[in-house]
A protein has these predicted regions:
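A short helix->loop->beta-strand "cap" motif at the edges of active sites that frequently abuts
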Residues: 23-31
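Oxyanion-hole/transition-state-stabilizing segment in secreted/luminal serine hydrolases
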Residues: 1-13, 40
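Amphipathic, non-transmembrane alpha-helical secondary structure
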Residues: 12-19, 23, 113, 117
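Catalytic His-Asp segment of secreted/periplasmic serine-dependent ester chemistry enzymes
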Residues: 37-152
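Anion (oxyanion) recognition and catalysis
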Residues: 19, 26, 60-64
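Short, amphipathic alpha-helical segments
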Residues: 8, 12-15, 49, 53
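Generic anion/oxyanion-binding catalytic loop in active/binding sites
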Residues: 3, 21, 101
Length: 152
């Protein structure tokens, strides 16, 4: 069995593809909400690197151009990972020493729950009326007020 070849689209093709989804959603009467990619856990000398720059920028530009709600998961998850720190954030990703597995892209269950929490927090910012339906705190375990103190 061979591993599938990774498939990538440059940011222009990616934006065109996402734009098609927005158009289709609107044609079907849905209200689209765009979400930038989840940050990868990639640190260099203690600094978290943005590995999705052009993709995230493409989604942000499309959301602005098409007047579509945006949850900036890339920004929020980078804030979250910085707040956790390099070593503690490892526990949220697929690091399985017994299987010699180190995966800083895919999440363990607790990481998936935390990221879902970030998405809900972003959704609540888009629609304050959702607050009454949210039954779980959405600080996502970040220390202090890392998410609410953001300046940008």
């Amino acid at each position: 069995m061979t591993k599938a070849t990774p498939k990538y689209a440059d940011d222009t093709v990616y934006q065109i593809s996402v734009d098609k989804v927005v158009t289709l959603a609107r044609e079907k009467g849905a209200t689209p909400i765009l979400i930038t990619p989840l940050a990868r856990r990639k640190f260099d000398h203690g600094q978290l690197l943005d590995t999705h720059g052009l993709y995230s920028q493409a989604v942000r530009a499309l959301a602005e151009r098409e007047n579509v709600g945006l949850i900036d998961l890339n920004r929020d998850s980078m804030d979250w990972l910085r707040a956790l720190g390099e070593a503690p954030s490892r526990d949220f990703f697929m690091h399985v020493p017994a299987q010699n597995q180190t995966d800083d892209t895919h999440l363990q269950h607790r990481g998936a729950v935390a990221v879902a929490c970030l998405v809900v927090a972003g959704w609540k910012q888009l629609d304050a009326g959702l607050q009454e339906y949210v039954v779980r705190d959405t600080d996502c375990g970040a220390r202090g007020t890392a998410l609410s103190d953001r300046t940008t």
